[in-house]
Amino acid sequence: MKTFLVCALEPSANLHLKEVLKAYKKDFGEFELHGIYDESLCKEFDLNSKPLYSSHEFSAMGFIEVLPLIFKAKKAIKELVNLTLSQTMDAVLCIDSPAFNIPFAKALKKAGSKIPRIYYILPQVWAWKKGRIPIIESHFDILASILPFDNQFFNKSTYIGHPLLDEIKEFKNQEDINHTFSKKDDEKTIAFLPGSRRSEIRRLMPIFKELSQKFKGEKILCVPSFNLEKLEVYGDISEFKIESNTPKVLKKADFAFICSGTATLEAALVGTPFVLAYKAKAIDIFIAKLFVKLKHIGLANIFCDFAGKEALNPEFLQDKVNVLNLYEAYNKYDYKAFFAKVDFLKEYLQFGSAKNLAKILNEI
């Protein structure tokens, strides 16, 4: 039985990790897990061990919100390195979170650890800080990429498919699309996804609540399962139906208003027309503009940019996020252009990410 140390700090990283572990258990059998991950995985996979730290302790967004976690991260890295030196591990799997995982990989190498290091979901060097490329390539043995264009920047990355295509169980078909077109406006189901972090929710929910008054049909507020016990951050949500399964919400919805993040790509792949709305602290936006050189911030639009396609969906940022702009975008939406690009995205990204990574873990 193999033993892995994983670093999955973000909610999305744990969703991807869960699928990888499912694929591994199905194809190769039992395993042991150490490191940083969601405690729910212990019960799901009947693990004897518990995480050194729960992933919830490290969830933050923006340059300012991350600062208080720096000292905790340094302490965690030291403990993780000691763990790898004191116990037999078959591989270290780092998922996303470059601000943590790159220093961790450096610390492992400095300590003389010979355990193979895998990086799954690579840092977005195509957006900013390309200087990290040689550092990443010299501190990780395998770079498992989920973006087809990563190999334009990394010399040794291997594209293994995008995890969302495996995690989404239902996609809209032509019958679903025709059903949406046949509905009157007051019959349509509208989904609101204000993000998963407290800061995102607080900035977007007042606008989303006011916007929701424009719609007479069913209104769904998508709340991540780990936030279901913290509904007070959303304010008065009595007019919404609360659901937590993002792909199912998007499959059911005729249209969605979404905070920037993984959910925007989920909506595109499921086939639900949407508008992206994003508000951050002014200082975060200022710093981002200094370093990030991209036309768009939504993943689906970024993919379209790299492929030389027109943007898939409208994006509204900062003071442009208001009821008037969002409702106007809904009324003027180009559905035909959206659905044409959805088909392109599915072909572009490919299935099989979890299964391919499980195979790498088994063979290492």
Swiss-Prot record:
EC number: 2.4.1.182
Alphabetical keyword list: Glycosyltransferase, Lipid A biosynthesis, Lipid biosynthesis, Lipid metabolism, Transferase
Top EC group: transferase
Catalyzed reaction equations: a lipid X + a UDP-2-N,3-O-bis[(3R)-3-hydroxyacyl]-alpha-D-glucosamine = a lipid A disaccharide + UDP + H(+)
A GO CC annotation given for this chain: membrane
Any one biological process term the GO annotation gives: lipid A biosynthetic process
Pathway field: Bacterial outer membrane biogenesis; LPS lipid A biosynthesis
Domain of life, source organism: Bacteria
Listed GO MF terms: lipid-A-disaccharide synthase activity; phospholipid binding
Keyword Transferase attributed: yes
Family: Belongs to the LpxB family.
Alphabetized NCBIfam families for the sequence: lpxB (TIGR00215)
Its job: Condensation of UDP-2,3-diacylglucosamine and 2,3-diacylglucosamine-1-phosphate to form lipid A disaccharide, a precursor of lipid A, a phosphorylated glycolipid that anchors the lipopolysaccharide to the outer membrane of the cell.
Protein name: Lipid-A-disaccharide synthase
Organism of this sequence: Campylobacter jejuni subsp. jejuni serotype O:6 (strain 81116 / NCTC 11828)
Lineage start: Bacteria, Pseudomonadati, Campylobacterota, Epsilonproteobacteria, Campylobacterales
